[in-house]
C-alpha cells in the first residue's frame, strides 16, 4: 500500500516494505521517494547522480551523498559540521573538511573523530585538543592516537 498523503510540493511517497514504517515524502525536486527504516529519525533526498539514498540514524545531524563509486552510505557524527564521502574500507566513520583532496581513514582506536586538515595525504590520527587541527602521519604508533 502506497502512502500518498504528502503535503503540497511533495511527490507521492513510495510503498513501504515491511521493515519500513512509514515511507517518507520527498520534495518535488527529487526524482524518487525514499523509504525510512524504523531506526531512522528522517531520511535524506539525494541527487539523481547519487546512489543510494542515505538514512539518518538518530545520532546524526546531517548525512552525506555517496557517489556511485562508493558501495555503502555513511553517517556523519554529530560533531561534524559538514559531510564527506568515506570509502567502505574506512572504519570507523570519519568526517573531513570539504577542502580535503581525499578521504581519511582513522584507526579504530582513535577517539573522538575530528576534522582532517586538507594537507593530510595519508591516514592518521588528529588531536581534538589542538586549536588548529593537526594530522599525524600513519607512521605514528596507534597508542599515540586520541
From Swiss-Prot:
Tissue expression pattern: Restricted to a narrow region of the hair fiber cuticle, lying approximately 20 cell layers above the apex of the dermal papilla of the hair root; not detected in any other tissues.
Residue windows of the Sequence repeats: 10-14, 15-19, 20-24, 25-29, 34-38, 40-44, 45-49, 55-59, 60-64, 65-69, 70-74, 75-79, 80-84, 85-89, 90-94, 95-99, 100-104, 105-109, 110-114, 120-124, 125-129, 130-134, 135-139
Taxonomy, superkingdom: Eukaryota
Keywords for this protein: Keratin, Repeat
Keyword tRNA processing found: no
Cellular component, GO annotation: cytosol; intermediate filament
InterPro entries: KRTAP_PMG
Residue ranges, annotated region (23 X 5 AA approximate repeats): 10-139
Record function comment: In the hair cortex, hair keratin intermediate filaments are embedded in an interfilamentous matrix, consisting of hair keratin-associated proteins (KRTAP), which are essential for the formation of a rigid and resistant hair shaft through their extensive disulfide bond cross-linking with abundant cysteine residues of hair keratins. The matrix proteins include the high-sulfur and high-glycine-tyrosine keratins.
Family in the record: Belongs to the KRTAP type 12 family.
Assembly: Interacts with hair keratins.
Protein name: Keratin-associated protein 12-2
Organism: Homo sapiens (Human)
Amino acid at each position: 500500500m502506497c502512502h500518498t498523503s504528502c503535503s503540497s510540493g511533495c511527490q507521492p511517497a513510495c510503498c513501504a516494505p515491511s521493515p519500513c514504517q512509514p515511507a517518507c515524502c520527498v520534495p518535488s525536486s527529487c526524482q524518487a521517494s525514499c523509504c525510512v527504516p524504523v531506526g531512522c529519525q528522517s531520511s535524506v533526498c539525494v541527487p539523481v547522480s547519487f546512489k543510494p539514498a542515505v538514512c539518518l540514524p538518530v545520532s546524526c545531524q546531517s548525512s552525506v551523498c555517496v557517489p556511485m563509486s562508493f558501495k555503502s552510505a555513511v553517517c556523519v557524527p554529530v560533531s561534524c559540521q559538514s559531510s564527506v564521502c568515506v570509502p567502505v574500507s574506512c572504519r570507523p566513520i570519519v568526517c573531513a573538511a570539504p577542502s580535503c583532496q581525499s578521504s581519511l581513514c582513522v584507526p579504530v582506536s582513535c577517539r573522538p573523530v575530528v576534522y582532517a586538515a586538507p594537507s593530510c595525504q595519508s591516514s592518521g590520527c588528529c588531536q581534538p585538543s589542538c586549536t588548529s587541527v593537526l594530522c599525524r602521519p600513519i607512521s605514528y604508533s596507534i597508542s599515540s592516537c586520541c
